[in-house]
Amino acid sequence: MKDLFKIYSNYQPAGDQPTAIASLIDGLESGLAKQTLLGVTGSGKTFTIAHVIQAMKRPTLIMAPNKTLAAQLYGEFKAFFPDNAVEYFVSYYDYYQPEAYVPASDTFIEKDASINEHIEQMRLSATKALIERKDAIIVATVSAIYGLGDPDSYLRMLLHLSRGEQSDQRKILKRLAEMQYTRTNLSLERGQFRVHGDVIDIFPADSEKEAIRIELFDDEVDNIARFDPLTGEILQRLPRVTIFPKTHYVTPRERILETVEKVKAELQERLAELNAQNKLVEAQRLEQRTCFDIEMMLELGYCSGIENYSRYLSNREAGEAPPTLFDYLPPDALLIIDESHVTVPQIGGMYRGDRARKETLVNYGFRLPSALDNRPLRFEEFEERSPQTIYISATPGPYEQEHSDNVAEQVVRPTGLIDPEVEIRPVKTQVDDLMSEIRQVIAQGSRILVTTLTKRMAEDLTEYLSEHGIKVRYLHSDVDTVERMEIIRDLRLGEFDVLVGINLLREGLDMPEVALVAILDADKEGFLRSERSLIQTIGRAARNVKGRAILYADTMTGSMQRALMETERRREKQKAFNLKHGITPKGINKSVEDILEGAYIGKRKTMVAEQAPRYTHWSPQELAKQINALEKQMYAHAQNMEFELAAKIRDEYLLLKEQLMKI
């Protein structure tokens, strides 16, 4: 246990970090159920939590409000703890359309989803780490409170094999099929197995690159090895191995048979109710759909929408909470909730929206009433299952303030950076004044964030600034996660200087190059101009030595006053600390790739953009000729499975087509 968790870092805790670390550790050792780390932007809250985890030596679940922040945290903890099991648990849907019925138009919408195979593998790897290891750190989103396969059924489906044990090949293959692995005779992919004589190759569903080879001799396991499925190279000989199921929802055969009997009984009961109410169409629909599901479960062991029978599959009573990731956590686990002022209300809001949709499906005969128990946790159930918890936020919400037994304050940054200076200027001349400020900041080589109240205003301001020769982009709600990361990356690299947004410039945007944050119409009281929103938005300039914030307002609202008072309180504390310890504030020099997961996407596009100048003077004929040549190269690389080269040429090809359209 001595070095269960070990941090790798060139830095030691500084500023308020040592005090905060000691306070949180003391609280955990004293048995406090809930604590809050009130840390300003850029104060190194992640580093503080890493030291708490290292000291406590306990498995940890970290929850973030969205996939973007979860990816950022995953990257940071992976760097701090390279020797430990840092895992990622978010929704594996790239696209998800839940099953729904609209009575007004008599429209039934079938469930439609696109599953990201890589994220599914990471989810399986996360639960495997919690089961097998004491040094697991799981970074998750609100997906952690949604129904997951029952851990007892999951553990009963494990396949344990040891060298020298008696094991019939047919039994192994039957077990793999029950675990939902599929047989193949071609190249081995994740979740598949292949048989050549007495050799069984298995590509575990939780593995990213390595497969397992089982060699049998006369019904005895003769050899077990880990190998590379691409090259066939043996990487390591193993004395024993445990193969985990392909999905969390795998269920033993006897449980399936029990479930079918319970579903049949509920179906008869529900049909009697519907017929008594003269709902004949609903009764016929329910009988047809449920009987089809029963047939599929008996034949295949699963069916489409099997999660709707999760109450029976996990052997629960009506209304009982579903099994979730929390059921896989060991009793001594820690729970860290990042940006808690957003994440806590998010957790509280998941249950009701899900319930309303499912009640309609039940009332109109699309699902049995037991489907209502396939749901996320209610907030009180989440509280019951939560181990010792630390909430992290620069602006803790009312729940954290009310329930925390200890608040560790982290106001002083290790870099000595002070909170931005805040000015208030009149609304009447806000656009012209902003233009003047933007030009000054650009001349210094820094960037600017501007936040507006409406989409229309953001669009108009972007157009106006662009017309006046300023390189500007608009970040709106239609931009997906990856594109949003690319836009932020381009801002940091200086591809453009001003980023305009509405409510997208708050939590977790790590941009040291931003020297000015401008908040237009700051005196319009509401969600976007609340005390928390203002403090968070002002904080976006806190990573720059010259960071400033300008609030355009004609009147001083209560939210503004409280936000300014809190910012000033922090500034005074930071300045006093710097003076006492002789610290000169230093800017944060973080490379773009350090901050953004998936930055390579933007990097490739930047490289392509750099080639643009050599094509600008080409004639349309020359461009067309080059486009045709690139198209042939692209398809040739794709046919040879050289997808990275094909993608690189594709970007250049699209750039040239765009150039040709302009001529």
UniProtKB/Swiss-Prot annotation:
GO terms for cellular component: cytoplasm; excinuclease repair complex. Residues 430-596 form the Helicase C-terminal domain. It comes from the Bacteria. Coiled coil: none annotated. NCBIfam families: PRK05298.1 (NF003673), uvrb (TIGR00631). The UvrABC repair system catalyzes the recognition and processing of DNA lesions. A damage recognition complex composed of 2 UvrA and 2 UvrB subunits scans DNA for abnormalities. Upon binding of the UvrA(2)B(2) complex to a putative damaged site, the DNA wraps around one UvrB monomer. DNA wrap is dependent on ATP binding by UvrB and probably causes local melting of the DNA helix, facilitating insertion of UvrB beta-hairpin between the DNA strands. Then UvrB probes one DNA strand for the presence of a lesion. Forms a heterotetramer with UvrA during the search for lesions. Interacts with UvrC in an incision complex. This is UvrABC system protein B. It comes from Legionella pneumophila (strain Corby).
